[in-house]
Amino acid sequence: MYVEAARLTLTIGALGIVFATVVGILCSAVEYYRIPVLRHIVSVYVELSRNTPLLVQLFFLYFGLPKIGIRWPAELCGIVGLAFLGGSYMTEAFRSGLETVEPIQKESALSLGMTPVQTMWSVILPQAMAVSVPSLVANVIFLLKETSVFSGIALADLMYVAKDLIGLYYKTPEALGMLVIAYLIILLPISILGTVLERRLRYAGFGH
């Protein structure tokens, strides 16, 4: 049971994080280039996303949208909800990284004939991502832990299975113990990998 639940948690979590990263890159680019109108939309999105719980967002998608004729499976609601929440955190992480890149580098790239898009993807973003590694890893861990609320929309994630074992067999210590172990198995390698990457990037001249 825990293996299947872990697979579901990882699959939905990974997809949500991938989309959150894409949203974060796009939104941080909008803020970096101060694009009119869009930057205000991004600001509203970031504030809305960061100041509402994931469970409320999931309830809106799973229970609210059907009221207007839009029905999504629970898995899709989980992915979209996690991407919506994570996108705002990734936006702030990338924005902080972008601010560390010296303006002269952008100006030099543009003077060499590179387009703004080429400058962003080839010059600015790689440096920003390197500096943002600690924040990005922290966000990934945070978002994977947030998947524990998926049981609220009937997704058979790790928390759902633990609740089932407690409710059906009254094995509270065993269920909670397995839950802790499962999350450690998932999250600890990510934390270690993040530490290794941070050290290597620091030795390479990125970060502080």
Predicted segments with their positions:
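Transmembrane alpha-helices and adjacent helix-loop boundaries
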Residues: 1-208
